[in-house]
């Protein structure tokens, strides 16, 4: 009997294993979020590249019209050169957009620790504008506090601290030890007649049974200090658990209001994109018919491109924010 030190040590080891497992799960969660963010960045850059290439096609069409008008005397040579410069500029923007897309693919491939990004690509999911009602932070927290690995790891360590106190207290109890054994021996002396092996086996056979009792009286307050330190550690871990819970609630609050802001921005950017696209189409017709100059056309085009870029950024930001809220509720990160 050792004051239940052995079973408490076993229980402590199991709790430490559980805490380490939750630490591993926390690391997996962090990787999942990083991969999701990198994946959404790829989708964002891919759509920007498509917009850039569409703009190249529009500029080429405008160039063809200007060249035709120039042959008919309806456009000046300067307007043709302006149209050519615009095509070259848009082609350069498209190349830059393609490069950004490839860099985003490279980042994700590195996160996945692929040997090379060559041949690596992603499948674009079908993303619909589903503005569902967001769960309140309090409701999300009630689910997250039961499932998040960081909280569970802190709880297991707090339980382990209680076992540590029991282990330290075990030195206050008497220690009862038991031992037993059996044995025999054989010897051979040169020049003397020796008994046979079988005879010695039986004659020299012995066995013993031993009990020892150790009663602690005074050990220079070593046990008291160990118990005191174990209790201090338990208090510190209890505070750490509460701090982890508070930090989790703050994270959820921030994620919630970020999602609300992203939803509002996405809705307004959709409206702005529709308006700027209609304005650009109208300006393109005016420019093609000579009713608008290059400056007006470029201004309308730049405004449209900016609103499209803002809309795409708002779209994937909103998608990421809502997925993070679901993730806190224990929903796996998917884009199906």
Language-model segments: residues:
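Small/polar, glycine/serine/threonine/aspartate-rich low-complexity segments that form flexible
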Residues: 8-9, 14, 124-133, 166, ...
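Long amphipathic alpha-helical coiled-coil segments
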Residues: 107-115, 321-335
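Metallo-beta-lactamase
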Residues: 97, 149, 314
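Structural signature of outer-membrane beta-barrel domains
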Residues: 1-2, 183-187, 218, 328
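Periplasmic alpha-helical coiled-coil/stalk elements that build and connect Gram-negative outer-membrane
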Residues: 30-143, 258, 262, 304
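Amphipathic alpha-helical coiled-coil segments
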Residues: 27, 31-50, 68, 104, ...
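Amphipathic, heptad-repeat alpha-helical/coiled-coil signature enriched at exported N-termini
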Residues: 2-38, 46-59, 77, 81-84, ...
């Amino acid at each position: 009997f050792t004051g239940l030190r052995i079973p408490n040590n076993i229980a402590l080891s199991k709790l430490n294993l559980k805490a380490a497992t939750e630490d591993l799960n926390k690391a997996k969660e962090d990787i999942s979020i990083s991969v999701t963010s990198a994946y959404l960045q790829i989708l964002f850059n891919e759509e920007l590249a498509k917009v850039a290439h569409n703009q190249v096609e529009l500029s080429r069409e405008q160039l063809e019209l200007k060249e035709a008008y120039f042959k008919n005397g309806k456009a000046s040579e300067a307007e043709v050169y302006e149209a050519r410069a615009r095509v070259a500029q848009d082609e350069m923007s498209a190349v830059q957009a393609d490069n950004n897309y490839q860099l985003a693919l490279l980042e994700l491939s590195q996160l996945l620790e692929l040997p090379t990004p060559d041949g690596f690509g992603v499948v674009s999911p079908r993303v619909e504008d589903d503005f569902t009602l967001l769960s309140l932070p309090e409701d999300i927290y009630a689910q997250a506090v039961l499932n998040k690995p960081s909280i569970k790891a802190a709880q297991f360590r707090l339980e382990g601290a209680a076992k540590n106190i029991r282990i330290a207290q075990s030195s206050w109890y008497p220690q009862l030890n038991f031992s037993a054994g059996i044995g025999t021996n054989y010897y051979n002396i040169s020049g003397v007649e020796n008994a046979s092996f079988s005879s010695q086996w039986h004659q020299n056979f012995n066995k013993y049974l031993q009990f020892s009792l150790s009663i602690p009286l005074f050990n220079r307050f070593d046990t008291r200090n160990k118990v005191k330190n174990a209790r201090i550690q338990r208090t510190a871990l209890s505070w750490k658990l509460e701090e982890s819970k508070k930090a989790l609630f703050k994270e959820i609050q921030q994620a919630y209001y970020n999602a609300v802001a992203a939803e509002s921005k996405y809705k307004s950017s959709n409206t702005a994109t529709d308006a700027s696209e209609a304005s650009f189409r109208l300006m393109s017709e005016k420019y093609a018919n000579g009713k608008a100059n290059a400056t007006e056309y470029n201004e309308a085009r730049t405004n449209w491109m900016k609103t499209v870029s803002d809309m795409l950024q708002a779209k994937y930001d909103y998608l990421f924010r809502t997925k993070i809220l679901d993730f806190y509720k224990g929903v796996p990160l998917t884009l199906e």
